[in-house]
Every structure is written in structure tokens, then in C-alpha cells.
Amino acid sequence: MEFHFFGTGSGVPSIERNVSACAVRFLQQRGKQWLFDCGEATQHQILRSSIALGKIERIFITHLHGDHIFGLPGLLGSRSFQGGENPLFLYGPKGIRSFVETALQVSNTHVKYELTIEEFSEPGLLFHEEGFKVETILLDHVMPCYAFKVTEDDRPGELLVDRLKAKGVPPGPLYRKIQQGETVELPTGERLEANAFLGPPKRGRSFVLAGDTRPVKELIPFAKNVNVLIHEATFLDDKKGHAHEYGHSTMADAIQLAKQANVDHLILTHISSRYHDMSDELQKKAQNAFANAVVAHDFYVFHLPLAKG
């Protein structure tokens, strides 16, 4: 699983940082690609990466501020010209349908693929299919804004070969079926339940990507024990009052949440342009407070391997 950051700034683009966008590539699932938020010039950033616009299957929007959605119309139109013939699903708060349909209609843009737009307003399960569960929770911003939690289904445990050999089952197709969780029948008529010949399930990976928000206690159980938490850190703590007034978090807020939720990795983004030329200082400050913290920059890629157990 790869996380590609195309925009790590806040509000408006700067020389160092574009506005919000992050793609996730699922390497073990035929390389499927999802996009979270789509600020202005996201498609241009994608051109400078290994992500293929035509292969993006789902887009998730945290909220309707311009720095998170102004790149959508152009990206949706360009997808048709970059091999994007397969269906595309777009998820976002109420209003995203009107924004997209109006922009495409006024600009006379016709997409050549099936575009499905799903609006949501209530937090909860968005879908559970293709080996992944996606859930949402409402945050605390100046407009409705959400976090997404993506949880990979658990994988079957290790095949207990010695136990199968003791049953007289030779290596072959039956091993593969059991590894896939299927019940098999031997030539003798005996049925073997897969669970009896598999070790403990291997926990699926998980991550939470939160949109703009003040600190919100409901995020603690929502992000509990996830592998990766992607959270805004618009300001440093000396601007805490200012941050909270405008619906944002500080670096210290995000780090406190990461500790309370016991996450493995924290990736900080949505950095104010006031901190230009301070990337090294920000990274040092974050890592001193949380060892597995990273202050993302544009084109930063984070790799999350398969869980071993």
C-alpha cells in the first residue's frame, strides 16, 4: 500500500506546497488507486508521479472548501483522455454532486466513462466491498467535514502443512483451496474445514485520513490502533487559539491524538504557508514528540507493507 501526497499545503497553493490531495495505491489488489481530496492542479501533480489518472477508481472528498475540490472538474474531464474508461465513484458531502455537475455542464465537458456520485451526510459505513471497509465520521470544522477510515479485510493465516500431511493430504490444489478458506472434501469423503488447518488470521491494514478539523475526541476511538493516521497540522502550538478559531489543529493537537489512539504512524499535512523553508525544523519538532511522525511534503510517498501477523 502506497500513499502519494500531491498537495500538503493549506488554503491556497504556494511555491513549496500545492493544496490538498493524496492518492493511495493498493499494490496487492491489482494496483487499484483511490484519491482523497482534489485541490486545484491535482491532475498536474499526478502527471509528475507514478499514479495513473485513468486508473483511479474512487475519489473521496472530505469537505467542500475550494482547496479540497477545485481540481475536480479538470481532473474528471482529463481522465477520459488518459485511458479512463472504467467506472469512477465519487464520494463526498452534500453539495458535491451539484458542484461537479454544474462545472461539467457549464464547461460543456462530457466524460466518456460511467461517473457515479454518492453524497453522504450521516457518519457511518460508506461501503464494504472488494476487500475493504470504508467508514466516515463527522469532524469539527467551519463547514461539514469528515474523516475516512479504510480497513482492509483480514487475510487467512498460514497454512498448517504438517497438520495436512498428518491427514494424508499431499501438496496440490487442495492446499490452495484451504489457503483461500474453502472447505474441501477428500476422496474418502471426509470434509476438512479450512479453519482447522490455518493459523490465526493476518490482520488487515488500516488508515484514517482526516479532513480539516479542530481537535475532536470522537476521532480517538475512530482511529484506535490504525496503521496510519493522516491528519492536518496547519499551525504550530503558539497559534493554537487562531487554529481552533478557524476550525484547524496544531501539530501538538495531532500528535496528542496519535498517542491517544495508539496509531503506528502519523503523517502530518495541510501545513500553513507561514512555515515556508521550515521543513527540516517541522520534521524535527514532530519526530521529537512522536517517533513515527512525518511532516509530508509534495510528492512524498509512504509505503505500508502487508502485516506479518
UniProtKB/Swiss-Prot annotation:
Q: Which residues bind Zn(2+) 2?
A: 67-68, 212, 270
Q: Does the keyword Zinc apply?
A: yes
Protein name in UniProt: Ribonuclease Z
Keyword terms: Endonuclease, Hydrolase, Metal-binding, Nuclease, tRNA processing, Zinc
Species of origin reads Halalkalibacterium halodurans (strain ATCC BAA-125 / DSM 18197 / FERM 7344 / JCM 9153 / C-125) (Bacillus halodurans)
EC code: 3.1.26.11
Concerning InterPro entries, the annotation shows: Metallo-B-lactamas, RibonucZ/Hydroxyglut_hydro, RNase_Z/BN
Tell me the function of this protein: Zinc phosphodiesterase, which displays some tRNA 3'-processing endonuclease activity. Probably involved in tRNA maturation, by removing a 3'-trailer from precursor tRNA.
Co-factor: note: Binds 2 Zn(2+) ions.
A GO term for molecular function: 3'-tRNA processing endoribonuclease activity
Q: Which domain of life is it from?
A: Bacteria
What residues make up the catalytic site? 67
